[in-house]
């Protein structure tokens, strides 16, 4: 995974991160279940990295989280893929960093 650029489209007065995620998902007509799953994975990602903002993280931290899920969490490939899709949505569509 290539490293992500360090200039996110987030300003100090921007709405809270998960609100931004939900708004983008609703604009694109994602199902409520997908919205819930993605926001849960994003929360878990942030908590895994001790509440660091995703804009301050990049591909290395995403890889660490996904590896942790596979090795320590022993999640299935489809579960790991769902977490990856949630993080891809966050970085590409919300933070506009990918």
Question: What is each residue range found by the language model?
Answer:
Residues 1-9, 19-33, 39-98:
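N-terminal core-binding DNA-recognition domain of tyrosine recombinases/integrases
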